[in-house]
Amino acid sequence: MKNWRTFILGLALCANGALAAPQVVDKVAAVVDNGIVLESEVDNMLSTVKHGAQEANQQLPDDTTLRRQILDRLIMDNIILQLAQRTNITISDEQLDQAIGNIAAQNHMSLDQLRSRLPYDGIDYNTYRTQIRKEMLIAEVRNGEVRRRVTILPQEVESLAQQIAAQTGNGAEFNLSHILIPLPENPTQDQLDKAEELATSIVEQSKSGADFGKLAITYSADAQALKGGQMGWGKLEELPSLFAARLQGAQKGSIVGPIRSGVGFHILKVNDIRGGDQKVAVTEVHARHIMLRTSVVMTDQQARAKLEDIAAQIKSGRISFAAAAKQLSEDPGSANQGGDLGWSSADAFDPAFRNALMHLKKGEISTPVHSSFGWHLIQLIDTRQVDRTDAAQKDRAYRLLFNRKFAEEAQTWMQEQRASAYVKILDSNGQ
């Protein structure tokens, strides 16, 4: 059950004492293989559903129909719980505690607050835990059984991804800022060179984090210069074709340009994008490192001091980073390549390594960094933006196909389980 956490909290908090009410007389509502469904279980859920519907102003069918649906649900749950028992699937106390903690967090409560809340709703905490454990077991069994039945072919993913791609960008709007470096009507080569040089410098400053609005006020000849170059929102088809062509695939925060037109050089900043599907880009880094491992003969302090000495030698020109890595690095995967780690997403690295790497400028060498692997001296060689839109569209297509097929197979699987089980209904109202 995808939303079992939310379901159970809603079930429990609106139960109005049903789960905790003592039962003087109980009857069997249905026999299910080696188990039973009690009348009290049906009555409790009936009361719960009615209370919840009243709170939500939701209309319900007549009692006979509602009771039959509830009994069917409890029978199915019983079948699955017996399957869990036969296949030795269990939910540990640790898993249960984590789930209840998640329920509390999702409802902006601490675990203690949740425990304190339950008695006010007439719910015993141990009964609550038992009910959640059942729901978790049911979800675990069903998901495991149904997942094995779902088959997704590569051509299905490709076909759906192409459909998604065909729809990408439709209706997207861009919030832009603009800087214009003007040119005279018939510019000389010198005027062209100077204007292009200034425009290129502004692009570099912007990409390095300079305030685009301030640069616009300082340099732009556009009518909106004093407003920081703000152009506001617009669709691609509403923009000059020169702009639209260069904005294809741009991301929020992108600096685009310089773009040459008849009036000068243009620089655009994408402040935001709304509507449509945005392109998916990730930052990849090209780095190299020297790694030392600590041991009985190499303490943390010694490793750090040795890397500091190596860094000083590299910066003074006495040895290159690559040569030092080949001689000294204890990373067998990169030492022979001069410590070169190639291109990779920053997320692929150890958190401490990644954090240090992302604070480096191109060519800069870090101070010694301690990670779960050892001590590192890191150099950032370059960064690049890589379009992952195609992969993202295929991932989305796969998820859509899986969810669709899972829902279909889950229904079929439950029908098969019900058909193969021995069920005798004794509740005349649930017939």
From Swiss-Prot:
Sorted keywords for this record are:
Chaperone, Isomerase, Periplasm, Repeat, Rotamase, Signal
S-S bridge residues: none
Give the reaction(s) catalysed. [protein]-peptidylproline (omega=180) = [protein]-peptidylproline (omega=0)
Q: Which InterPro entries does this one have?
A: OMP_Chaperone_SurA, PPIase_dom_sf, PPIase_PpiC, PPIase_PpiC_CS, PPIase_SurA, SurA_N, Trigger_fact/SurA_dom_sf
- Chain segments annotated as coiled-coil in the UniProt record: none
User: Per the UniProt entry, what are the Gene Ontology biological process annotations, in alphabetical order?
Assistant: Gram-negative-bacterium-type cell outer membrane assembly; protein folding; protein stabilization
Is 4Fe-4S there in the keyword field? Answer: no
Occurrences of domain PpiC (ranges)? 171-272, 282-382
> Which EC class does it fall in?
isomerase
| Gene Ontology, cellular component aspect | outer membrane-bounded periplasmic space
Principal localization?
A: periplasm
Q: What is its EC number?
A: 5.2.1.8
Q: Which residues form the signal peptide?
A: 1-20
Record keyword tRNA processing present: no
Q: Where in the cell is it found?
A: Periplasm
Q: Which GO terms describe its molecular function?
A: peptide binding; peptidyl-prolyl cis-trans isomerase activity; unfolded protein binding
Annotated function: Chaperone involved in the correct folding and assembly of outer membrane proteins. Recognizes specific patterns of aromatic residues and the orientation of their side chains, which are found more frequently in integral outer membrane proteins. May act in both early periplasmic and late outer membrane-associated steps of protein maturation.
Domain-related comment: The PPIase activity resides only in the second parvulin domain. The N-terminal region and the C-terminal tail are necessary and sufficient for the chaperone activity of SurA. The PPIase activity is dispensable for SurA to function as a chaperone. The N-terminal region and the C-terminal tail are also required for porin recognition.
- HAMAP family named among the record's database cross-references: Chaperone_SurA
Q: What is this protein called?
A: Chaperone SurA
